[in-house]
Amino acid sequence: GLGDVYKRQLKDNAVIPVLFLNTLFSSLIFLPFIVLSVWRPGILENSIFYVPVAGWEVHRYVVLKSVIVLSSWMLGYFGMKNLPITIVGPINATRPVMVLVGALVVFGERLNFYQWIGVLMAVFSFFMLSRSGKKEGIDFKHNKWIYYVVMAAVLGAVSGLYDKYLMAPADQGGIGLDRMIVQSWYNIYQLFMMGGILILLWWPKRKSTTPFHWHWCIILISIFLSAADFVYFYALSLDGAMISIVSMVRRGSVLVSFIFGAMVFREKNLKSKAVDLVLVLIGMIFLYLGSQ
């Protein structure tokens, strides 16, 4: 949630260099763990920060993870630059619903009565949210930034399902990768990908697009997102972890973004958005109850 809030501070900044710096600082956070695990394995071995050595048969899965996450990030950043955070937050809060539907199709999970209530309430709240957006001149059908945020949410859901596949043992439908391999290396792969995008796409047109200016929020975003991902991957690595529940709790970050949008950014139509947010949260609660 705090990561989303600090992203909002970069509304008038160039997206691509900001993303490049995010991946750079995130990589720098985890690079010492990789180096120590290789050169002084005794220091981190048997700790939660140890990064095992792995070959291409493992890293190819991490590269795909990097592509999915980076695509979601880019779409999300462009959308967030052009939409109120109180619109973006609840749309992102529908990710657990998409993850649950994906788990239903991909992993063969079945929805019970409470889970169906949760899904329907979340979908209904999304349509209610579109009405709140129109009060600010945002038409969900004709505003391309809405589609950016929706696609970012879809890719985020795909990423969540893929995380389940990466972390879960073979007997639970996954391949059982080490979580530190995934988080440490996918940041580094993202760094190289963003470096290429920065050089090829942004640098030649930098004078005719939104200018880049340095802000300390860029470092804070990297720290908060890295910390959130670390706890998230740790949760998924626990035996019997359910991606539908983990994803639902994670998207509780919408509370933080909504509170800051109301108190700090003074965004409009908060009463109607609050109703939509309550519907999203009630839907999440029913999903939780149905998963007990």
Would you name each region that the model predicts?
Residues 14-71, 121, 181-205, 257:
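Transmembrane alpha-helices of multi-pass small-molecule transport proteins
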Residues 97-158, 164, 269-292:
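Juxtamembrane helix-loop boundary signature in multi-pass membrane transporters
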Residues 2-6:
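Short, small-residue-biased leader/transition segments that mark boundaries at the very start
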Residues 1, 66, 70, 97-101, ...:
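Hydrophobic/small/kink-forming positions within alpha-helical transmembrane segments
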Residues 25-29, 91-105, 120, 189-193, ...:
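Alpha-helical transmembrane segments of compact multi-pass small-molecule transporters, enriched
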